[in-house]
Structure formats: structure tokens, C-alpha cells
Design a protein with these regions (language model features):
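C-terminal regions of RecA-like/P-loop NTPase motor modules
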Residues: 1-14, 20-21, 53, 110-116, ...
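The Walker A/P-loop phosphate-binding site
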Residues: 2-99, 318
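Conserved inter-motif catalytic segment of the P-loop NTP-binding fold
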Residues: 30, 72-170, 178, 306-314, ...
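Hydrophobic/aromatic beta-strand patches that form the interior of the parallel beta-sheet core
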Residues: 47-49, 77-79, 122-124, 195, ...
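Structural recognition of the conserved hydrophobic beta-strand(s) that form the central parallel beta-sheet
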Residues: 78, 154-155, 192-199
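Cofactor-binding loop segments of dinucleotide-utilizing enzymes, especially the Rossmann-like FAD-
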Residues: 81, 199, 241
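Signature of the SF2 helicase/ATPase Hel1-core->accessory helical subdomain module
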Residues: 160, 201-202
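A short alpha/beta connector and helix-capping loop motif
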Residues: 167-183, 193-197, 244
Length: 319
């Protein structure tokens, strides 16, 4: 073959036969068992996570990253511009891993957790401005310095990316389309999952008969930046906290700590599907749990595992 600009079937027949027999390989669970039927992880494809402020977008992304480090030894590079100082972000990750605040852990637990987080997480200096190219160049620099290969990257929030509108005649839609294309290419050539976290646009409030007003879940074309996200996305996830004044499809009122994970787009075929499932926040452990076959499961737990009980009393002393 003279070049790689195009392919005849004969160039890919071996790969085709392998794929037809085995399908997608190396598909991984997010560690949240209730999501496995609609959402799985596949390296080489980006994930876009959206939601309103205070919906838990960052928390959900951190949960996936902690889970995949525990389950598969995955390593992560994170830009988190709205998570406080770098030490605050590390504190959050340590709390998730320990399932209790760092200062409540004994010295042995602290050392073990520090080693785990140090081995698997690098946090970018969010006081610096990054274009998407500069961000991925920084990821490559860290890989070279630490002699590691990152399995995921995360840029949160998307609107912190340095805008280069002058290259696109001042058109934000063209700039956005180009950035999302670069993210797609980055995931593919690096065989990793590049995560972008985005806000939603303004959603019109709904008023119930009793006068109660609430914001419904945003549609896929109601993310900040518009339908370009929908067009460019592979996996598109909305994190939504339903109001307790509403009931779910089974007629049961939503719980105060309930979050709906809504898969609004799923590509490639075979790794998920459009749908939704609820997960529940345990503020004390800083982790999510869910239900599978009516059994309570924390992240990384399976049906046969021993179950911890969630902390849902928000007035309870932490420890």
C-alpha cells in the first residue's frame, strides 16, 4: 500500500474477520453496575459529559476514573478548573478512594491512599491557559516525564479551553467543531478515552399545577454550544438531578440523593445504547451506589459482594 489516505477491503480483510468474530474488544465497565446495560467504556473514543451546575458532572467523571484505576489500573490526566486548588482536587480523590475524609484516615490508610492516587492521577495547573492542542501536548509531556501511558484525560469545564476564534472568522460553531474533531482524533491515535465536561444551555422551566417550578433534563441539542456537540459526539452523557417533587416511571418520588445518568448518544455500536439509569450519592463516603436486581451496589461491587449501607442523613456527623 502506497499511502494511508484510503483503503481497499483487501487491506483490512484480516481486521474485518477478527472484528466479525469477536466484535469490540476490551470493553470495560464504568464500575457502576446499574449502568452496564446502557454504558460501557471503550478506549479510542471520547466521552462528553454535560449537565447543569450542581448536577454532579465532575463527581461522576471522578467516580469513573477512580473505579477504572481500582478495577484495571488505569491512569488519568485531569484539568479541573472549577474544583478548587490542586490540593483540593487531590483531597476529593483521596476521599473517594478512602470512602472517608483524608483527615479521618489512620496513617496506614493515608499512606496506601497517597500511593494509589500518586500512581494513577496527575492534575494539570489550571491557572494556565490551554488550547486543546496545548492541553494534549502537556499530557504527552507528563507521559514522557513519568514514563507512563494515560488511559483517560479529562478537561473540565470545556469553556476553560482557550478560544481561538480568529482562526475561524470569529465563528464559535466552527471553532467548537474543530476542537471536538481534535478530541476525537486524540482519543483514536492515543488509544485512550478523552473526556470533556460541558455545561448545558438555558433550559425553560416547567411549572406544575401547584405552582412548583423545576428545570427538566436538557435535550441533546441544549448543551452549551448547541447541536454541534450532538453531531460530533460518540458517547454523550447528561448528568441530571431530578427534583423530589417528581416521580419516576414506576410512580416512585425521586430521592434527594438521586441522579439520573442519561445516555443521549452512544457510538460505536455495541458499547451502549440510548437510555437512563439512576445512581445515588453517599455524601459520607463521597461515592455513588446503585441498585441491580434490587440489590444495593457501591462502585466496583458485584451482586455477590458484601454490601455497605449508604449514608443518606445529611444532618449526621461525618464520622
Amino acid at each position: 500500500m502506497k499511502n494511508n489516505k484510503y483503503f481497499n477491503l483487501s487491506h483490512k480483510i484480516s481486521d474485518l474477520k477478527t472484528f466479525s468474530e469477536q466484535g469490540h474488544k476490551d470493553i470495560k465497565s464504568s464500575g457502576l453496575s446499574s449502568l452496564d446495560s446502557i454504558f460501557m467504556l471503550k478506549k479510542g473514543y471520547p466521552i462528553f459529559i454535560g449537565g447543569a451546575p450542581f448536577s454532579g458532572k465532575t463527581e461522576f467523571a471522578f467516580e469513573i476514573q477512580i473505579n477504572t484505576s481500582i478495577l484495571y489500573g488505569w491512569k488519568h490526566f485531569i484539568y479541573c478548573g472549577e474544583g478548587g486548588n490542586v490540593e483540593h482536587i487531590y483531597s476529593e480523590l483521596l476521599h473517594k478512594y478512602l470512602k472517608k475524609p483524608y483527615n479521618y484516615a489512620d496513617e496506614k490508610e493515608k499512606l496506601h491512599a497517597e500511593y494509589f492516587i500518586s500512581e494513577n492521577f496527575i492534575i494539570a495547573n489550571h491557572d494556565l491557559d490551554f488550547s486543546i492542542k496545548e492541553f494534549y501536548d502537556t499530557v504527552a509531556e507528563a507521559e514522557k516525564e513519568y514514563n507512563i501511558k494515560f488511559d483517560t484525560t479529562m478537561f473540565d469545564p470545556f469553556n476553560d479551553i482557550k478560544e481561538e476564534l480568529e482562526k475561524f472568522g470569529g465563528r464559535e460553531d466552527k471553532f467548537l467543531a474543530d476542537v471536538l474533531k481534535q478530541v476525537r482524533i486524540s482519543s483514536k491515535i492515543n488509544n485512550r478515552i478523552d473526556i470533556l465536561v460541558n455545561h448545558i444551555a438555558d433550559v425553560r422551566a416547567v411549572t406544575l399545577q401547584d405552582g412548583t417550578r423545576y428545570l427538566p433534563a436538557a435535550l441533546a441539542n441544549e448543551w452549551a454550544g448547541g447541536r454541534t456537540w450532538w453531531r460530533r459526539a460518540f458517547t454523550m452523557i447528561l448528568v441530571y438531578r431530578p427534583p423530589i417533587c417528581l416521580k419516576n416511571n414506576d410512580g416512585i418520588p425521586y430521592k434527594e440523593n438521586e441522579t439520573e445518568i442519561i445516555i443521549q448518544k452512544s457510538k460505536p455500536k455495541g458499547i451502549g445504547k440510548v437510555g437512563k439509569s439512576s445512581i445515588f450519592w453517599d455524601w459520607k463516603k463521597n461515592r455513588y451506589y446503585s441498585y441491580l436486581e434490587n440489590q444495593l451496589l457501591y462502585s466496583c461491587e458485584k451482586i455477590e459482594d458484601y454490601k455497605l449501607q449508604p449514608s443518606t442523613d445529611f444532618n449526621e456527623h461525618p464520622f
